[in-house]
């Protein structure tokens, strides 16, 4: 949504930071990390993604981050706000949001078990698959 706005629209309709976004004072987004385990590796493949959330969730998470609270809340529910072109359509996939200590982006988990991304997140991917995804992404950006 934000990416499709003209610059003038962004300046008047959107308030965006590195981890939060509000559009038209009615649409609320949080940024999180979706980790896909790479089999045989300690490091996962990490997607930095936006999730749309209800205003109440946005406000509670904002308070948590702003006040530096120790107690983690959630998990929260949201909807993926990105289309990952290397997968079948991901826009609006149900997502679970788990807060991490302040200063760390929330972890995201896809809630629709039949989707390829959810299956890969649950079972992990081979190094070859991780390289394939990375290669597809690099070639798309050109």
Set out the residue ranges of the language-model regions.
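Basic, glycine-/proline-tolerant helical and adjacent loop/strand elements
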Residues: 1-39
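Context-gated lysine
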Residues: 6-7, 13, 31, 54, ...
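Intrinsic-disorder/low-complexity loop/linker signature
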Residues: 25-26, 42, 63, 112
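Long, charge-rich C-terminal accessory regions
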Residues: 32, 39-84
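C-terminal, charged low-complexity interaction regions
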Residues: 64-142
């Amino acid at each position: 949504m934000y990416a499709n706005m003209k610059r003038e629209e962004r300046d008047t309709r959107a308030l965006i930071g590195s981890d939060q976004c509000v559009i038209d004072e009615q649409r609320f987004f949080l940024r999180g990390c979706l980790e896909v385990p790479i089999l045989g590796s300690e490091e996962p493949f990490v997607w930095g993604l936006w999730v749309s959330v209800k205003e109440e969730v946005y406000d509670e998470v904002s308070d948590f981050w702003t006040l530096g609270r120790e107690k983690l809340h959630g998990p929260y529910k949201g909807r993926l706000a990105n289309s990952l072109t290397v997968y079948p359509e991901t826009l609006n996939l149900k997502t679970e949001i788990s807060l991490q200590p302040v200063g760390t982006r929330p972890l995201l988990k896809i809630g629709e078990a039949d989707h390829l991304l959810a299956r890969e997140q649950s079972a992990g991917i081979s190094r070859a698959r991780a390289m394939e995804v990375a290669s597809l992404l690099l070639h798309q950006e050109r």
